[in-house]
C-alpha cells in the first residue's frame, strides 16, 4: 500500500465553537431552629465561607458525605480522585488503564460524570461542551484538598439544574499558620510511582503562601496504557480580622497512551484481558503492529481569585473570579483513509493511504461567582449567582 510521504505538507481543518452560559441565580429557603445558637464565628472560619454556598448542611434535605483530608491521605498513593472516593455509598468507578492512574470516571447512583456537578472552591470544573469531568488534567490534586463533599441525587451547586445526578464539591487547602515542608514518594504495581514536594511559609503579617509539585507515572495494567503526568498547586492568602483574599493557580500536564476502546472480542476478554486495540495496524508484510505514539497529550491551568468579607455579625459576602486555559491533542495512526476527507490531493494517483493525524483542542473558560449570606439565630438566607463563558477551538492536523 502506498502512504503519504513523511515530509508531506501539514494541513489543518478548524472549527470554532463559542458557548455562553446562562446567568444563574440560586436562592435558599429560610431555615428555622427552635432555639437560638451562639455566634461562634472566628477569623479562621472565613476559610470555610468560600464554599458555603455549594455545601449541604445537617438541616438540608440532601443525602451527602463529607470526606476530610486525613481520610483521603492513607489512600492517596497516585490514583485519581474518583478511585480515592470509590468506597463512598452509591459510587462506582472505572479506569481506562486498569489501575486508577490516568483517565478515570465516576458514577453516582448510576448517573455518569456528565450529570455530576463538580466544583473546585465553588468554581465549575465540568467540561463546558461534554459536561464530563477529566481529573487526569489535575494530577495528584488530592494532595491539595482540605475537604470533599459528595451529594447524592439532587443537591446544591453553582452549576444549577445539572446537579440532579450528584454534586462533588471540593475545597482546597487553606492557609497554614506554621511553616512546613514535606516530601512524599510511593511506588506500586505496574511500575506505578508518585513523587510529591510541598511547602508552606506559615502565616506572617497576615500573609501566607503554600505550594506543591507532583509527578505521577505508570505502565498501567492494560497493554501500553502508560501515563506520565505533572501537577502543581500554588495558594497565596491575605488574612485579616474580617476579610480573606486568596489567589490560587493549579493545573497539570499529562501524556497517556490511549486505552479507552475496550474489548469487543469475547475470546480476547477471556484469554487476553490486558489486550489494547489502540494504535493497531497491519504492516506491508501482513504483520500486526502497534503505533508507539497513539497518545493523549493535554495541559490545563486554573486561576482563581477569592474574596470573603464579614460585614457584620449577620452579613457575609463572597466573590470569585476564575479563568481556565487548556490545550492539547490526541494522536492516531489511521489505515486506508480517504485523502479527500482531509481535503488532501491524491498521492501518486492514489486517494487511499495510511496517515497519522492529531486532533486538537484549544479551550478557554472564565467567569465570576458571588454570594451574600444573611444569618441570624433563626434565619439563614443565601443569595448568589454566576456568569461564565467558554471558548472552544477544534482542529485537525495530518502530520504523516
Regions found by a protein language model. Give the residues of each.
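Short acidic/polar hinge/loop motifs at secondary-structure boundaries
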Residues: 124-152
Amino acid at each position: 500500500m502506498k502512504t503519504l510521504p513523511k515530509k508531506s505538507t501539514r494541513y489543518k481543518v478548524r472549527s470554532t465553537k463559542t458557548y455562553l452560559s446562562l446567568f444563574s441565580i440560586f436562592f435558599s429557603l429560610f431555615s428555622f431552629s427552635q432555639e437560638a445558637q451562639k455566634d461562634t464565628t472566628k477569623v479562621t472560619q472565613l476559610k470555610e465561607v468560600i464554599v458555603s454556598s455549594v455545601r449541604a448542611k445537617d438541616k438540608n434535605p440532601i443525602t451527602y458525605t463529607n470526606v476530610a483530608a486525613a481520610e483521603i491521605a492513607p489512600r492517596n498513593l497516585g490514583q485519581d480522585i474518583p478511585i480515592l472516593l470509590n468506597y463512598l455509598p452509591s459510587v462506582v468507578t472505572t479506569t481506562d488503564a486498569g489501575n486508577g492512574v490516568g483517565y478515570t470516571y465516576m458514577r453516582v447512583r448510576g448517573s455518569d460524570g456528565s450529570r455530576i456537578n463538580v466544583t473546585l472552591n465553588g468554581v465549575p470544573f465540568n467540561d463546558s461542551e461534554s459536561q464530563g469531568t477529566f481529573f487526569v488534567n489535575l494530577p495528584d490534586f488530592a494532595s491539595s484538598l482540605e475537604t470533599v463533599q459528595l451529594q447524592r441525587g439532587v443537591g446544591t451547586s453553582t452549576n444549577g439544574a445539572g446537579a440532579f445526578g450528584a454534586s462533588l464539591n471540593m475545597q482546597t487547602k487553606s492557609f497554614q499558620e506554621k511553616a512546613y515542608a514535606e516530601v512524599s514518594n510511593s511506588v506500586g504495581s505496574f511500575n506505578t510511582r508518585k513523587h510529591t514536594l510541598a511547602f508552606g511559609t506559615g502565616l506572617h503579617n497576615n500573609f501566607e503562601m503554600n505550594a506543591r509539585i507532583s509527578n505521577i507515572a505508570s505502565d498501567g495494567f492494560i497493554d501500553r496504557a502508560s501515563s506520565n503526568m505533572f501537577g502543581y498547586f500554588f495558594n497565596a492568602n491575605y488574612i485579616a480580622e474580617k476579610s480573606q483574599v486568596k489567589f490560587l493557580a493549579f493545573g497539570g500536564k499529562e501524556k497517556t497512551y490511549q486505552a479507552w476502546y475496550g474489548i469487543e472480542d469475547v475470546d480476547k476478554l477471556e484469554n487476553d484481558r490486558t489486550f489494547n486495540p489502540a494504535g493497531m495496524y497491519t504492516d506491508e508484510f501482513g504483520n500486526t503492529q502497534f503505533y508507539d505514539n497513539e497518545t493523549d497529550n493535554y495541559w490545563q491551568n486554573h486561576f482563581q481569585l477569592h474574596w470573603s468579607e464579614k460585614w457584620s455579625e449577620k452579613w457575609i459576602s463572597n466573590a470569585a473570579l476564575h479563568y481556565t486555559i487548556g490545550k492539547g491533542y490526541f494522536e492516531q495512526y489511521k489505515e486506508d483513509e480517504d485523502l479527500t476527507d482531509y481535503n488532501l490531493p491524491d498521492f501518486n494517483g492514489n486517494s487511499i493511504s495510511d496517515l497519522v493525524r492529531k486532533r486538537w483542542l484549544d479551550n478557554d473558560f472564565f467567569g465570576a461567582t458571588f454570594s451574600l449570606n444573611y444569618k441570624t439565630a433563626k434565619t439563614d438566607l443565601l443569595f448568589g449567582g454566576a456568569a461564565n463563558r467558554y471558548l472552544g477551538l477544534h482542529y485537525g492536523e495530518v502530520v504523516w
